[in-house]
Each structure stands twice: as C-alpha cells, then as structure tokens.
Amino acid sequence: MPFALLCFFSLFSAVSVYASPFKTIGLVSAWDPEMKALKRAVLAPGANVRNTEIDGTVFSEVQQRGRRLVIWMSGVSMINAAMSTQLAIDHFHPDAILFSGIAGGLDPSFQPGDVVIPERWIHQAEAAWLNRDPERSGSYVIPEYFRPRYPNFGNIFPDDVWVVRKGDTTPHRVHAFAMDPNLFDAARVTAPKVSIRRPDGSKANVVIGGIGMSGPIFLDDRSFRDFAFQKWHARIHEMEGTAIAQVGYSNRVPILIVRGLSDLAGGQRGVNQEERNTQLAASNAAEVTAEIVEQIESAQ
C-alpha cells in the first residue's frame, strides 16, 4: 500500500538521521534471566567486554559498530532501578538508555510471550491512602492539602509526582513520563522484523504504544488489574520502568522500555505462571531490544 510504504520510509529516515548522535547506549535489565537474555541477543560473538564495578553494580562496556554499549543489571524494583540508572548516567554519560525485561499484562487482549513497548509510563504507588468517612458511606475523608485528580481504588487515591529536571531548579508536577520519540519511532520500524512466539508456539505480538505502570509490588490481583486498565488505561505492570523513565526525564536522557509478558498480573485462571514463562518473555523482549539497538548502530 503506497501510504503505508510512505509512512515506513518516513519513519526510517527520521530514525536514521536522529540515531547518529547516540554514540553511547545504555542497556539495562533488572535481574539475571533478563540480563542473560539481553546479552545473548545484543552482543556480537567474541565481543571484547570491559567490566567496571561501581558501588556494587557491574557495568559492562563494549564497542560495537562504532557505538559504545554500557550494560548493567539494576536489581529488582523501583529504588534499585533508579539508583543504578543514575550511577550509569553520572559515570558513563549514555546518550540513550533502553530497558529489556518482563512484565505482567493488564490489557485483556495480551497473552504471555507478547512484547509491549509503551509510549508513556506512570507510577502505581504515588498516592494518598485515606480514611473512610464515617458519616458518608462510600466516601473518604479528604485532607485540605490534597485534591483528588484521578479515579481512586478504594481508599487509594493516585497522584502525580513532583520532579526537578536538569537545568532547572523548580519542581513541577508530572503524571506520565513519555518515551523518547525518536527511540519510539525506531521501535515502530524495527519491531515488525522480529519473529517471536508465545508459550503455546503461536505467533506473539509486538505492541507499540499506550501506557505502562510501575510500582514496588508484584501484581497478581484481578481487581486492581481491571481497575488499572479500565480507569488508568495502563496496558502492562512491572517494577522498574517508571523509575528509570523518571531518572531519564530528570537528567534529560532519552529512554525506551521494552517488556515481554511473563504473566497476566492476576488475570489468569489459577496460579500465576510467571516463573514458567520468564525465560521466553525475557528472550522475546531482548530480541526486540536487539533489533532496535541494531537500527541505532547501523545509522550513519
């Protein structure tokens, strides 16, 4: 179709022009299965890797296709992710950071094995927990300092986070952290090239766009899953992405987060199958991430 081809070549051109400043690319995963899959997918055979330990985190550097890759394992959950990302920015000055790992699916159309690359990321646990109003059934006692802005989940009222950016000294309110548009365009171009499978052997989807949600909680609860999708329009949930997105936003470093679905975050029947699907989900995310990195590396 001519229009589709025109869109494809327009995106390819934009990515090629913009990607060239990405001389140093940070690549991060949270834990061992994700990290092994990422290195297996991204590193060329026989790559000459130089390891540097900083405050307990090991950073692996390699020169590949004229780019410097800096790879590290953040550790699981929000604070670990934020701390290690700031370490990487302070010591290695990456021009862009990509995360590869697993997540739980909130969107009912998703299945384990699918890969999702959200365009925006929100906090799950940035909220006020309020008392019930004893005089009004179904209501809560709202403090004078707090103004509800978003639908609540029982007594939990989500709120924005206040952030200071590099080059500024005034905190401002942020609801969602957007991914870098040029990295996001690179994902649009390269993702369809990847052939990945679900646990049952059927073709897995690579979904671009929507909202991702992060919090310091392993989500395996159907009621919150339904609420997050219906009210916040969040499509996946995990434990690091928004923290990394916020650190990137504060430092003005482009970010992209790629997630393979290991489970349905409580939407399944019976016991959660995250452990059974981890290897496949991590590998699928890493394969998509590797294609995006290759697109950046090959740009002139």
What are these regions (language model features)?
Residues 2-14:
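Bacterial N-terminal signal peptides
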Residues 17-19:
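Boundary at the C-terminal end of the N-terminal hydrophobic targeting segment
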Residues 21-25, 53-300:
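Glycine-rich phosphate- or other oxyanion-binding loops that anchor nucleotides, phosphorylated ligands
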Residues 25-33, 38:
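Gly/serine-rich nucleotide phosphate-binding loop at the start of the catalytic core
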Residues 38-45, 64-65:
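A short, Lys/Arg-enriched amphipathic alpha-helix followed by its capping loop at the start of a domain
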Residues 42-57:
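Short catalytic helix/loop segments, enriched in acidic residues and glycine
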